[in-house]
Amino acid sequence: MTKYIFVTGGVVSSIGKGIVAASLGRLLKNRGLKVTIQKFDPYINIDPGTMSPYQHGEVYVTDDGAETDLDLGHYERFIDINLNKYSNVTTGKIYSEVLKKERRGEYLGATVQVIPHVTDALKEKIKRAATTTDSDVIITEVGGTVGDIESLPFLEALRQMKADVGSDNVMYIHTTLLPYLKAAGEMKTKPTQHSVKELRGLGIQPNMLVIRTEQPAGQSIKNKLAQFCDVAPEAVIESLDVDHIYQIPLNMQAQNMDQIVCDHLKLETPAADMTEWSAMVDKVMNLEKKVKIALVGKYVELPDAYLSVVEALKHSGYVNDVAIDLKWVNAAEVTEDNIKELVGDADGIIVPGGFGQRGSEGKIEAIRYARENDVPMLGVCLGMQLTCVEFARNVLKLHGANSAELDPKTPFPIIDIMRDQIDIEDMGGTLRLGLYPCKLKAGSRAAAAYNNQEVVQRRHRHRYEFNTKFREQFEAAGFVFSGVSPDNRLMEVVELPEKKFFVAAQYHPELQSRPNHAEELYTAFVTAAVENMK
């Protein structure tokens, strides 16, 4: 029988529910259980694919091509699993499916209502996420906070699950903020008490509290919360602020969180062996050397827009025994005159993905600087496309060369729309998304990075591609297409082999990086940057 764990939040949003859920998932996995995890987002968008990164941070893409919340990146990195389209559910997606069923007459003339039709659809998503992965345990995080109007159907579905599958198979975990008032010199429990009261008013009694706090709460605070919120004192878990997020599973384990969960759900498993994870955390906490990486991006004011890129760099730093000293460079402010000032002290330059004209010329300048000064450079997605544009302009002397996305009237469309995208008008969910194979050129930097594998599978999110009409011209000038699709139509990886490291990929390598298994192309880049340290 599958066990269901539901993680809700109160008092404030962005309290760390996703990290709590991911940490618990790691602990349960290390007990030998098969775990999956999903995020419920109560916004009306179908998915975050068309949302501005300023609104929502990065869009995380799964193997099967779902555009999802960035929390899924935390889930995959912590638990080291690959999720699917059932792992991210939004209000928009549910209502869209319910309305389509109504139009097809599948409700047989019934009045379509939130209860039971919307709640049934939500419960079906929970169960489908578990069955498609054959999981012992599924953890479901509900975005936002208790009391939000948008969350009500989701919480009602969670309430109903207890009756559907039995109380021994369901556990509710509520995360809240425990604020410390410096002037009063004490922690305040009232916000948590009121949040739990609100949750209980919706028919859900939490079995565990996770309290986010800046400093240890002490047993008296835990006892008080236990008394007023009707949970066991040992089930009040502190989520202390830490220097590194990968410490959190160890902190949770030290408070027996996973054992309490297993006891409640009647799961008999051995204790979680966190030896390897603990060794990784010890290493992370004691890195002495730093390598400086300049990230030239469009959305640098919001680091969450590049969350997976940053994490992948960190993971590759662990392999090289270095911390990443990240220098954020706003591509929109980069010019030929100031590029040396902005990136001249960097040991490596990364140009990540993005969309639109703004900042593209600044990214091209950064790529030119890296090529001309032999600074290790990694381009990703749009970064790969602009690497091709830069080479066309400055080496092949194709003046006015550009991407057709950025300049539809360019005389040299080095990057053009994919053939199967030409007649598509909708923006959402229509990109080339998900896992696709890439055939690597023997003897190339890319092949070396991937331990000389012939084919790798990586996740994509793009609509435009390299225009193969220019391929021979590029190759004649020494530009190497070191990764291509198996049918040889799509150029996936490009490089200049005479440079220290000048490689760019159409796919998103960062989406498959893990703290205990860094993504290989990122690792090769960071290794080159370390060798280039000033």
UniProtKB/Swiss-Prot annotation:
<dbReference type="GO" id="GO:0004359">
    <property type="term" value="F:glutaminase activity"/>
</dbReference>
<feature type="binding site">
    <location>
        <position position="13"/>
    </location>
    <ligand>
        <name>UTP</name>
    </ligand>
</feature>
<dbReference type="GO" id="GO:0005524">
    <property type="term" value="F:ATP binding"/>
</dbReference>
<keyword id="KW-0547">Nucleotide-binding</keyword>
<feature type="binding site">
    <location>
        <begin position="148"/>
        <end position="150"/>
    </location>
    <ligand>
        <name>CTP</name>
    </ligand>
</feature>
<dbReference type="GO" id="GO:0042802">
    <property type="term" value="F:identical protein binding"/>
</dbReference>
<keyword id="KW-0479">Metal-binding</keyword>
<feature type="binding site">
    <location>
        <position position="463"/>
    </location>
    <ligand>
        <name>L-glutamine</name>
    </ligand>
</feature>
<feature type="binding site">
    <location>
        <position position="54"/>
    </location>
    <ligand>
        <name>L-glutamine</name>
    </ligand>
</feature>
<dbReference type="GO" id="GO:0046872">
    <property type="term" value="F:metal ion binding"/>
</dbReference>
<feature type="binding site">
    <location>
        <position position="13"/>
    </location>
    <ligand>
        <name>CTP</name>
    </ligand>
</feature>
<comment type="similarity">
    <text>Belongs to the CTP synthase family.</text>
</comment>
<feature type="binding site">
    <location>
        <position position="224"/>
    </location>
    <ligand>
        <name>CTP</name>
    </ligand>
</feature>
<comment type="function">
    <text>Catalyzes the ATP-dependent amination of UTP to CTP with either L-glutamine or ammonia as the source of nitrogen. Regulates intracellular CTP levels through interactions with the four ribonucleotide triphosphates.</text>
</comment>
<feature type="binding site">
    <location>
        <begin position="188"/>
        <end position="193"/>
    </location>
    <ligand>
        <name>UTP</name>
    </ligand>
</feature>
<feature type="binding site">
    <location>
        <begin position="382"/>
        <end position="385"/>
    </location>
    <ligand>
        <name>L-glutamine</name>
    </ligand>
</feature>
<dbReference type="Pfam" id="PF00117">
    <property type="entry name" value="GATase"/>
</dbReference>
<feature type="binding site">
    <location>
        <position position="224"/>
    </location>
    <ligand>
        <name>UTP</name>
    </ligand>
</feature>
<feature type="binding site">
    <location>
        <begin position="14"/>
        <end position="19"/>
    </location>
    <ligand>
        <name>ATP</name>
    </ligand>
</feature>
<dbReference type="GO" id="GO:0044210">
    <property type="term" value="P:'de novo' CTP biosynthetic process"/>
</dbReference>
<dbReference type="InterPro" id="IPR017926">
    <property type="entry name" value="GATASE"/>
</dbReference>
<dbReference type="GO" id="GO:0005829">
    <property type="term" value="C:cytosol"/>
</dbReference>
<dbReference type="GO" id="GO:0019856">
    <property type="term" value="P:pyrimidine nucleobase biosynthetic process"/>
</dbReference>
<keyword id="KW-0067">ATP-binding</keyword>
<feature type="active site" description="Nucleophile; for glutamine hydrolysis">
    <location>
        <position position="381"/>
    </location>
</feature>
<comment type="subunit">
    <text>Homotetramer.</text>
</comment>
<dbReference type="InterPro" id="IPR033828">
    <property type="entry name" value="GATase1_CTP_Synthase"/>
</dbReference>
<dbReference type="Pfam" id="PF06418">
    <property type="entry name" value="CTP_synth_N"/>
</dbReference>
<protein>
    <recommendedName>
        <fullName>CTP synthase</fullName>
        <ecNumber>6.3.4.2</ecNumber>
    </recommendedName>
</protein>
<comment type="pathway">
    <text>Pyrimidine metabolism; CTP biosynthesis via de novo pathway; CTP from UDP: step 2/2.</text>
</comment>
<keyword id="KW-0460">Magnesium</keyword>
<feature type="binding site">
    <location>
        <position position="141"/>
    </location>
    <ligand>
        <name>Mg(2+)</name>
    </ligand>
</feature>
<dbReference type="InterPro" id="IPR004468">
    <property type="entry name" value="CTP_synthase"/>
</dbReference>
<dbReference type="InterPro" id="IPR027417">
    <property type="entry name" value="P-loop_NTPase"/>
</dbReference>
<feature type="domain" description="Glutamine amidotransferase type-1">
    <location>
        <begin position="292"/>
        <end position="534"/>
    </location>
</feature>
<dbReference type="InterPro" id="IPR029062">
    <property type="entry name" value="Class_I_gatase-like"/>
</dbReference>
<dbReference type="InterPro" id="IPR017456">
    <property type="entry name" value="CTP_synthase_N"/>
</dbReference>
<feature type="binding site">
    <location>
        <position position="71"/>
    </location>
    <ligand>
        <name>Mg(2+)</name>
    </ligand>
</feature>
<feature type="active site">
    <location>
        <position position="508"/>
    </location>
</feature>
<feature type="binding site">
    <location>
        <begin position="188"/>
        <end position="193"/>
    </location>
    <ligand>
        <name>CTP</name>
    </ligand>
</feature>
<keyword id="KW-0665">Pyrimidine biosynthesis</keyword>
<keyword id="KW-0315">Glutamine amidotransferase</keyword>
